[in-house]
């Protein structure tokens, strides 16, 4: 067949030219880098591998919400880099178990426990508290920080409130039980005050190194338990200062050999002037404006390292200790410069360098560690490696406040992680953190946690509704439903939200915006479901399943879901070997359908008793098992299996509150009874007898039993007589009251 004329002009047929779509520019992950104070494109040094060092805790007390602020936030960042952006993250964290705070706390705890075991007499305790109070008053007068001063004043007032009752009980010769009770109260209230005094007096005599390892070992264990409870991933490598002393000594030696350190009186200091004047280096990269801040520098050196003799060892006030010569009462290790221990800043440099080498991608820590700790880390490490890029990206988590107030261990207003987990679940705490920027201040308050709880409920209800829709019976082909405009619109919104979430994660891992986009997607999905149900139509199963699986996967990436469930939060805890929902739900579905059939017959026959039983099953019995039936007119009952642990926890909380009220009431009644008994015992003493038993104070008395001479036979001064007369007159009144009570028959 002959070709048409037009076709003949084209010659041999070929494919037309093709050009790719213009598309959009792909976003790249940017992180806020403290080294530039700007968001920078994140580019690891070695392909997709990311080396990361995180400053761990100084383990001398319970982990608090300030710790949670850093470690949950870094856990979220780590998971997102690993599981969303698909980086190969190698994460190293340290444990500081050699530190001035640990040494001081260990000595104080040890000496106080020894003091308690020795069981001082009430008189001796009163005398010791008096002596310790003098030292404490000096400490108070030298304190300029208003918050810390307020805390010290509270301690002082508490001690005085406990001191006077014991003194009065001893003077009045109250029953031994009452004196013992007052003795224990004063001992407990004066613990901080006595510990300081005992440390100043006997601290240098604590020489057993093993004593200094017990405290950090215990608190490290508690820290790891807290992190596990918060679902914080363990580090790939954990380094302890006590296990890296040889590496630290070698690290310090090389810094000295490179000309950036000097030995002074057995200690080794970093020469900030020499380092800063080098063309290859810069000192205080993170907070250059803080150079010369002696208060911050001294806090970095530690309480045991800022005495006048220590400070005189430095060439410059800005220099800091790499190695500290140990004094009596401090743990020590051998070194080329004599017995000593590592400085705080050098510990991280040596351990991070040992594991990650001369340059790492990310270094993380709390905002308050920027200067001097991290600036000094940078200086030491770059002096050791003779480079200018020890850390490529420095990430600092924001502060944590408690209901708008500063949180500090020294102020004793911190909430421990265990305390927080008594009130809220690990997921709720994590959601609260996700709802805030990782680098900004987070206010831990009832409002913050209520927002997290409501978000969790909002998401969970959506997941439960979708699961109910997916359980509706259908054949194989029935799962593929025709798409109308509503499905097309929801699907478009779904992909728009996914794109917005990606943009937010690329923008300094903005989880706050991500959660809002997820909330918006759920709201759109809920509107779609409601519209379908209103029209008596079945929502598109596959579309809702895709949306739910995506949201679940994002929450898994954030560490808010641990289970392998495809959709939603796990039911019945996170460590179940079986899937409770898939096992139980078929039976609940049968029960629901049977109940609906019974209700239908009861309505037709107007059997109200059966309807009441049906409602009782829904409202009273099934909630006890963590099951919720939701009845909708004209539609099948929605069956939801909720977390049983949550219900049990709510009950336990209510029970605890009731028990606490009962305990306080009983305690108040007991105290009142004891006070009345003590008062009655005091009232029974005739005024002419009250001083006669005090032979250790007085030798002569007048006809009324009033003392006139002391034990040495000297007449009492007018001042002494005036003071005793007041006590005598007070006792006269009390005794008269007692006699009146006897007369009235009301005294026992």
Swiss-Prot record:
EC number(s) recorded for this UniProt protein: 6.1.1.16
Swiss-Prot/TrEMBL GO biological process terms: cysteinyl-tRNA aminoacylation
Binding site residues for Zn(2+): 55, 348, 373, 377
Binding annotation for ATP: 409
The protein's required cofactors: Zn(2+)
Chain span(s) of sequence motif 'KIIK' region: 101-104
Amino acids binding L-cysteine: 56, 96, 373
Subcellular location: Cytoplasm
Entry GO terms, CC: cytoplasm
Region annotation Disordered: where it falls in the sequence: 1-25, 656-719
GO molecular function: ATP binding; cysteine-tRNA ligase activity; metal ion binding; tRNA binding
Gene3D superfamilies the UniProt entry points to: HUPs
InterPro entries (UniProt xref): Cys-tRNA-ligase (IPR015803), Cys-tRNA/MSH_ligase (IPR024909), Rossmann-like_a/b/a_fold (IPR014729), tRNA-synt_1_cat_dom (IPR032678), tRNAsynth_Ia_anticodon-bd (IPR009080)
Subunit: Homodimer.
Function: Catalyzes the ATP-dependent ligation of cysteine to tRNA(Cys).
Record-given protein name: Cysteine--tRNA ligase, cytoplasmic
């Amino acid at each position: 067949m002959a070709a048409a004329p037009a076709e003949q002009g084209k010659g041999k047929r070929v494919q037309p030219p093709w050009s790719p779509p213009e598309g959009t520019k792909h976003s790249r992950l940017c992180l806020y880098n403290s080294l530039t104070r700007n968001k920078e494109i994140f580019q690891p040094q070695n392909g997709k591998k990311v080396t990361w060092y995180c400053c761990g805790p100084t383990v001398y007390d319970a982990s608090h919400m300030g710790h949670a602020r850093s470690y949950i936030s870094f856990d979220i960042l780590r998971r997102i880099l690993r599981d969303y952006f698909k980086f190969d993250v190698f994460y190293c964290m340290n444990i500081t178990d050699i530190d001035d705070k640990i040494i001081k706390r260990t000595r104080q705890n040890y000496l106080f426990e020894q003091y308690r075991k020795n069981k001082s007499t009430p008189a001796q305790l009163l005398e010791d508290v008096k002596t310790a109070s003098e030292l404490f008053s000096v400490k108070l007068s030298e304190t300029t920080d208003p918050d810390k001063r307020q805390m010290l004043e509270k301690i002082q007032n508490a001690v005085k409130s406990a001191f006077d009752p014991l003194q009065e009980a001893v003077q009045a010769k109250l029953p031994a039980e009452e004196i013992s009770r007052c003795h224990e109260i004063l001992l407990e209230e004066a613990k901080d005050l006595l510990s300081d005094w005992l440390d100043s007096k006997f601290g240098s005599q604590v020489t057993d190194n093993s004593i200094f390892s017990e405290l950090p070992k215990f608190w490290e264990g508690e820290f790891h338990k807290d992190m596990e409870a918060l679902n914080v991933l363990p580090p790939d490598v954990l380094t302890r200062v006590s296990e890296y002393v040889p590496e630290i000594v070698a690290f310090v030696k090389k810094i000295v050999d490179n000309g950036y350190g000097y030995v002074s009186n057995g200690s080794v200091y970093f020469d900030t002037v020499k380092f800063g004047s080098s063309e290859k280096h810069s000192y205080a990269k993170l907070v250059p404006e803080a150079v010369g801040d002696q208060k911050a520098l001294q806090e970095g050196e530690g309480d045991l390292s800022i005495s006048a003799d220590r400070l005189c060892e430095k060439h410059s006030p800005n220099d800091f200790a790499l190695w500290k010569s140990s004094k009596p009462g401090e743990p020590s290790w051998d070194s080329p410069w004599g017995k000593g221990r590592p400085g705080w800043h050098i510990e991280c440099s040596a351990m991070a360098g040992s594991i990650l080498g001369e340059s790492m991608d990310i270094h993380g820590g709390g905002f308050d560690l920027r200067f001097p700790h991290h600036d000094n880390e940078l200086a030491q490490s770059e002096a050791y490696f003779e480079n200018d890029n020890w850390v490529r990206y420095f990430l600092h988590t924001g502060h944590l406040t408690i209901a708008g107030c500063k949180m500090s261990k020294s102020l004793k207003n911190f909430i421990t992680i265990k305390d927080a987990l008594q009130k809220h679940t690990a997921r709720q705490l994590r959601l609260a953190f996700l709802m805030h920027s990782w680098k900004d201040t987070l206010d831990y308050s009832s409002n913050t946690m209520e927002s997290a709880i409501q978000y969790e409920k909002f998401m969970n209800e959506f997941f439960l509704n979708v699961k109910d829709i997916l359980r509706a019976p259908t054949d194989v082909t029935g799962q593929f439903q025709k798409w109308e405009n509503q499905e097309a619109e929801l699907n478009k919104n779904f992909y728009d939200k996914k794109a917005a979430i990606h943009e937010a994660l690329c923008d300094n891992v903005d989880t706050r915006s991500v959660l809002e986009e997820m909330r918006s997607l759920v709201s759109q999905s809920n509107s779609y479901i409601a519209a379908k149900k209103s029209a008596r139509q079945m929502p598109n199963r596959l579309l809702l399943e895709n949306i739910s699986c995506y949201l679940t996967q994002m929450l898994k990436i954030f560490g808010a879901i641990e289970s392998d469930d495809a959709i939603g939060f796990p039911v019945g805890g996170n460590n179940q070997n079986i899937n409770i929902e898939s096992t139980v739900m078929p039976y609940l579905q049968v029960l629901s359908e049977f109940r609906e059939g019974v209700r239908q017959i009861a309505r037709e026959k107007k059997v109200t008793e059966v309807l009441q039983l049906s409602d009782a099953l829904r409202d009273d019995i099934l909630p006890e098992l963590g099951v919720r039936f939701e009845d909708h007119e004209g539609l099948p009952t929605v069956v939801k299996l909720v977390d049983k642990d949550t219900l049990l926890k709510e009950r336990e909380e209510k029970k605890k509150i009731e028990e606490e009220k009962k305990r306080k009431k009983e305690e108040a009644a007991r105290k009142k009874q004891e006070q009345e008994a003590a008062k009655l015992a005091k009232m029974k003493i005739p005024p002419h007898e009250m001083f006669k038993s005090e032979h250790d104070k007085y030798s002569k008395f007048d006809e009324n039993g009033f003392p006139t001479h002391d034990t040495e036979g000297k007449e009492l001064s007018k001042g002494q007589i005036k003071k005793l007369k007041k006590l005598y007159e007070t006792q006269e009144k009390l005794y008269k009251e007692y006699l009146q009570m006897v007369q009235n028959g009301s005294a026992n």
